């Protein structure tokens, strides 16, 4: 598959087909090609000998998609940066990535960034003045060059830039289109922010098949009336989201085939799909196919998939996450470094062309997590699991990295920032489960000296500081204050004891 050429052919075959819709804004395939070509031409003329990644700032604006393609046509990887990411984190991404340019389809509220900022008005001028000009196709990202870089949580307090190459993305997109039986011209739900790699599961399968991306933003999600009004207008056929989002939608009785009569495929990734959620979806959308998938950001969105049927639900108390895509393979590694036999639990290791080339500017972290096996890149996921008859079962994290509401995070990073807050002497993050999956984060805090009369005021002050350093989804929901943190005999935090205390 020639990814960019496949997207561009729709500008010729169906130029007026809508490529992306967000609220009242939309772009056609013709506009997508013209504006991304114009942008790529401008980037190449401004930075002829430079291939540093480019930050793309915004939320769900159509310009985000134009900017992504403009970057890669000019030979630059893009870094999606959502509006919700705190200024301090944006600053660290800019410094780590070596980016020299930031493209924005909205107002940039972050100050003192070490990059050149191209505003929304600047972009409009570029689209106009460079209209009709085409970039040199030889300059476009290709092969093992980075296509995008997504920053994930890092245990040192610094985000890690996962480098996904053109070949990685082609491997994923080709597999998704074929294995999920995606058809030409379908409407795809775009629910995940672009800085979250779940969004890749809808963006590129939609664009290469001439589909329409129907974006819903965080403000819509916070107002169910607006959300369901948008869904009723959408005629979505391919649903891509975390299971948690679908579970929330299922609380609305009208969320069914009557609301979305042409629903064909549900694609889930990012967290465990509970059996009860899958059963309700089968009841409400009897004609739709439900796919459960698995994969870390470091392996390009997902590498396994399974069609969830009533028979599968009856057979397994906890759903398997699927069979591996044909060009990759899974190894289950025991602690001694040997391969575990069928049915035995160990660390999931992914091998093949979906695997990232590593973390940008972090050779030590890359060496720790990535390796070569039989001449192919391999990623040690840190996830526990086992394989039976080719079917992968996921058993949670081996370390303190978790997925909460679809977002992957390292508890050590949150603890790092929490301990740096005023009024905090010590802290441990305890993830609290509800059934099979994590429900929220609890911060167990040893407070420092303070003058607050009430605990809730202390909590508000700590949360205010955390909001300056971490995304909202990494802020603990509840706080508990103790005089000390329990320790094990070998001097480590006794997390098991803490968990038993807080859940007693």
From Swiss-Prot:
D-alanine binds at residues 197, 301, 492. It catalyses: holo-[D-alanyl-carrier protein] + D-alanine + ATP = D-alanyl-[D-alanyl-carrier protein] + AMP + diphosphate. Pathway: Cell wall biogenesis; lipoteichoic acid biosynthesis. It holds the Pfam family AMP-binding. ATP binds at residues 152-153, 292-297, 383, 394-397, 492. GO terms for molecular function: ATP binding; D-alanine [D-alanyl carrier protein] ligase activity. Disulfide bonds: none annotated. Its main location: cytoplasm. GO terms for biological process: lipoteichoic acid biosynthetic process. It is found in: Cytoplasm. Keywords: ATP-binding, Cytoplasm, Ligase, Nucleotide-binding. InterPro entries: AA_adenyl_dom (IPR010071), AMP-bd_C (IPR025110), AMP-bd_C_sf (IPR045851), AMP-binding_CS (IPR020845), AMP-dep_synth/lig_dom (IPR000873), ANL_N_sf (IPR042099), DltA (IPR010072), DltA-like (IPR044507). CDD domains: DltA. Gene3D superfamilies: 3.30.300.30, N-terminal domain of ligase-like (3.40.50.12780). The keyword ATP-binding applies. It comes from the Bacteria. Its EC number is 6.2.1.54. It is an enzyme of class 6 (ligase). One of its GO terms (cellular component) is cytoplasm. Belongs to the ATP-dependent AMP-binding enzyme family. DltA subfamily. Catalyzes the first step in the D-alanylation of lipoteichoic acid (LTA), the activation of D-alanine and its transfer onto the D-alanyl carrier protein (Dcp) DltC. In an ATP-dependent two-step reaction, forms a high energy D-alanyl-AMP intermediate, followed by transfer of the D-alanyl residue as a thiol ester to the phosphopantheinyl prosthetic group of the Dcp. D-alanylation of LTA plays an important role in modulating the properties of the cell wall in Gram-positive bacteria, influencing the net charge of the cell wall. HAMAP family: DltA. This is D-alanine--D-alanyl carrier protein ligase. The gene is dltA.
């Amino acid at each position: 598959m020639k990814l960019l050429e496949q997207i561009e052919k729709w500008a010729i075959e169906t130029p007026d087909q809508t490529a992306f819709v967000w609220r009242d804004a939309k772009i056609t395939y013709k506009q997508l090609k013209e504006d991304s070509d114009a942008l790529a031409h401008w980037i190449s003329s401004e930075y002829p000998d430079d291939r540093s990644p480019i930050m793309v700032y915004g939320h769900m604006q159509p310009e985000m998609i134009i900017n992504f393609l403009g970057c890669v046509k000019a030979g630059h990887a893009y870094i999606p940066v959502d509006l919700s990411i705190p200024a301090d984190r944006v600053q660290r991404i800019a410094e780590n990535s070596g980016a020299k340019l930031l493209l924005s389809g909205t107002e940039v509220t972050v100050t003192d960034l070490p990059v050149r900022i191209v505003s929304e008005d600047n972009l409009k001028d570029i689209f106009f003045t460079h209209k009709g000009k085409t970039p040199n196709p030889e300059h476009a990202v290709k092969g093992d060059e980075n296509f995008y870089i997504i920053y994930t949580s890092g245990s040192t307090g610094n985000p890690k830039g996962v480098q996904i190459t053109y070949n990685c993305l082609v491997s994923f997109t080709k597999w998704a289109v074929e294995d999920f039986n995606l058809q030409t011209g379908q409407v795809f739900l775009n629910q995940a922010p672009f800085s979250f790699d779940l969004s890749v599961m809808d963006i590129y399968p939609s664009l290469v098949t001439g589909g329409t991306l129907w974006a819903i933003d965080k403000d819509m999600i916070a107002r169910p009336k607006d959300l369901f009004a948008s869904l009723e207008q959408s005629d979505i056929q391919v649903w891509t989201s975390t299971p948690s989002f679908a579970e929330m939608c299922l609380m609305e009785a009208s969320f069914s085939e009557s609301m979305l009569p042409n629903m064909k495929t549900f694609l889930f990734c990012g967290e465990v799909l509970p059996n009860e959620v899958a059963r309700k979806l089968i009841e409400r959308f009897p004609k739709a196919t439900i796919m459960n998938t698995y994969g870390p950001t470091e392996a390009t969105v997902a590498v396994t998939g399974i069609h969830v049927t009533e028979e599968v639900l009856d057979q397994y108390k906890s759903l398997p996450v699927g069979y591996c895509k044909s060009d990759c393979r899974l190894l289950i590694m025991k602690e001694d470094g040997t391969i575990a036999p069928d049915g035995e639990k160990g660390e999931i290791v992914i091998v093949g062309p979906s695997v990232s080339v590593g973390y940008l500017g972090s050779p030590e972290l890359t060496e720790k997590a990535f390796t070569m096996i039989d001449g192919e890149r391999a990623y040690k996921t840190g996830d526990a699991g086992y394989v039976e008859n080719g079917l992968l079962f996921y058993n949670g994290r081996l370390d303190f990295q978790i997925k909460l509401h679809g977002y992957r995070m390292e508890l050590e990073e949150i603890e790092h920032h929490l301990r740096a807050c005023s009024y905090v002497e010590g802290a441990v993050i305890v993830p609290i489960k509800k059934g099979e999956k994590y429900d929220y984060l609890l911060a167990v805090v040893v407070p420092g000296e303070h003058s607050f009369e009430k605990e809730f005021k202390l909590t508000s002050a700590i949360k205010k500081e955390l909001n300056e350093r971490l995304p909202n989804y990494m802020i603990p929901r509840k706080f508990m204050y103790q005089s000390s943190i329990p320790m094990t005999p070998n001097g480590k935090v006794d997390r098991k004891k803490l968990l038993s205390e807080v859940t007693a």
